[in-house]
């Protein structure tokens, strides 16, 4: 197992994924890996007796604000072992080496990821523990049939009136700079991510695309909230990828305003992924979102005392799928 700069082995790594019928990795590599390496990330590879890459794992840093301090999490992603070598011991050695190398560098406080069932079994034996469960939540905001859509619209209008729903301004992502929402605003005890343009470009293919919209709220002349939505797609489904807000703003107030805004764009359902055990998920549910069956474990291991504090505070995580490998 060797730590490498993935940019120096780009074609070999891409070929490993293509051979495993994961061609979507190639454009992701092209748009995400240079920024990941520049931020301090890297890859680990394993080779066969002929020197060909047959295993790969990457880890990229993600900055968070946790109460009054900054912490850095390492997002492990793109783990793959070629089929002839797909057994417990090679995968265990790869994950163990990557974790220990990351610990030795001293740049990150914890490492986290959302593995599939088989990878989780290996990670459990590498010192990773389950922090919680990433769960999908869906908010019905409309319907293609007017006889169903009309009552839904009346419900959202009523909820907005009762909650004092915010009037959000829609801004095409292609014409809007989200720099003012890069840092978590205000003071909060929660774990909240920093975001930058490179993360949006990496996570959302084609960003800023025609379907990418920021819905913003200003109070006292400053940006109080920004919500990033992609969609709706042809089925009417839109994704809520980022919630950047002053901690004093109730999520329900923002969502009631957002529901009315996305209805105007023929959205029928709005979905978001977050940690089910968190206070943020409680706010999501109280805003009208309904949990669905889709879920995935989120596991992590601490590298520093600050990282240990983060892992013991699952209820304080305020993340979405934008912050995970999901």
Regions found by a protein language model. Give the residues of each.
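Active-site/acyl-donor-binding loops of N-acyltransferases
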Residues: 32, 61, 109-163, 226-249, ...
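Conserved acetyl-CoA binding element of GNAT-fold acetyltransferases
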Residues: 70-83, 234-246
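Hydrophobic, well-ordered secondary-structure scaffolds
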Residues: 74-81, 93-104, 111-124, 136-140
């Amino acid at each position: 197992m060797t730590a490498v700069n993935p940019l120096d082995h780009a074609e070999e790594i891409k070929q490993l994924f293509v051979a495993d019928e994961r061609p979507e990795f190639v454009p992701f590599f092209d748009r995400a890996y240079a920024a990941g390496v520049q931020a301090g990330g890297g890859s680990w590879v394993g080779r066969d007796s002929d020197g060909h890459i047959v295993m790969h794992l990457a880890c990229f840093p993600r900055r968070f604000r946790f109460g009054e301090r900054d912490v850095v999490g390492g997002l492990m992603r793109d783990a793959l072992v070629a089929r002839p070598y797909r057994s417990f011991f090679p995968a265990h050695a790869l994950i163990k080496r990557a974790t220990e190398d990351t610990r030795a560098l001293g740049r990150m406080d914890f490492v986290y990821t959302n593995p599939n069932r088989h990878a989780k079994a290996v990670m459990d034996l590498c010192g990773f523990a389950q922090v919680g469960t990433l769960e999908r939540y869906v908010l019905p905001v409309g319907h293609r049939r007017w006889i169903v859509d009309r009552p839904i619209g009346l419900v959202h209008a009523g909820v907005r009136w009762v909650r004092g729903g915010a009037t959000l301004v829609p801004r095409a992502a292609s014409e809007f700079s989200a720099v003012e929402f890069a840092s978590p605003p205000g003071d909060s005890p929660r774990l909240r991510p920093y975001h930058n343009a490179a993360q949006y470009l990496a996570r959302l293919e084609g960003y800023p695309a025609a379907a990418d919209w920021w819905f913003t709220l200003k109070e006292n002349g400053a940006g109080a909230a920004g919500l990033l939505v992609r969609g709706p797609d042809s089925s009417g489904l839109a994704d809520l990828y980022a919630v950047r807000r002053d901690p004093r703003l109730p999520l329900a107030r923002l969502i009631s305003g957002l529901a009315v805004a996305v209805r105007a764009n023929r959205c029928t359902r709005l979905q978001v992924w977050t940690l089910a055990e968190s206070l943020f998920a409680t706010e999501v549910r109280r805003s009208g979102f309904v949990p669905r069956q889709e879920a995935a474990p989120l596991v992590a291991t601490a590298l520093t005392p600050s990282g240990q504090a983060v892992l013991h505070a699952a209820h304080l995580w305020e993340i979405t799928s934008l912050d995970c490998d999901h």
